[in-house]
Amino acid sequence: MDIILLERIPRLGQMGDIVSVKDGYARNFLLPQGKALRANEANKKHFEIQRAQLEARNLERKSEAEKIAEKLDGKSFIVVRSAGETGQLYGSVSTRDISEIITSEGFSIGRNQVELNHPIKTIGLHTIMLSLHPEVQISVIINVARSASEAQRQAEGETLTSAEAIYDVRKELLAENQEETFAENQQKALAKEMNDNDANSINEEA
C-alpha cells in the first residue's frame, strides 16, 4: 500500500514522503495511529493544504519531547520482582510495567513508546530505549531486583547472580525464615500462656 507519512518514521521516511508498505503494517499501525494517510489524490491535496500546520505541530511536539528528555534521559527506575537464586524472574517485566513505573514518577510515557523486543525475565540493570518523539529517543535504566536493598547493591555495581551473591541470598532467606519461625513460636507461646491463665482463673473461681 502506498501511504503519505504524517511524521518521521525510522527506517521508513520523513513527513510528506510517499512510501510503499505492507498492507497489514499500514492498516494495523500507521493509519489508525494517525502516522500516515493512504496516498490517493484526495489525501495528497489535503496533505499539501495541511503541510504547514502539520510541520508546526510536529515542531511543537518535538520541543516538548526534548524538554522531557532533558529530565528523563539516563534516569534509573527500580522494579521489585520475585526471582530465584540465579536471578530468573518468576514472572516478567513488560512494556506496560515499564510505562507504569515511569509514569508513577511523574513522566507520562505510553507503553508504545517503550522499545522492548522481549519482556525482561532476569534481575539486573537493563538499558531500555524510549521514543518520546520520532526524532527524540533516549535511554533509561530499569533496575530489576528482588528488593530495594538489592536494587541499591546493583546500582553500586554488584552482580547479584554471582556465586557470592547467591550465597548471600540464601543466607538472607534463611534469616528471614528463622525470624518468621521465631515470631510464630512467640505468638504460640503467648497464646498458650493466656489460655493457661484463663484456665487458672476459672479454677480459682470454682
Swiss-Prot record:
GO terms for molecular function: rRNA binding; structural constituent of ribosome. Residues 197-206 have a biased composition (Polar residues). One of its GO terms (biological process) is translation. It holds the Pfam family Ribosomal_L9_N. Keywords: Ribonucleoprotein, Ribosomal protein, RNA-binding, rRNA-binding. Gene3D superfamilies: Ribosomal protein L9, C-terminal domain, Ribosomal protein L9, N-terminal domain. The keyword DNA-binding does not apply. Residues 182-206 are annotated as: Disordered. HAMAP family: Ribosomal_bL9 (MF_00503). NCBIfam families: L9. Binds to the 23S rRNA. This is Large ribosomal subunit protein bL9.
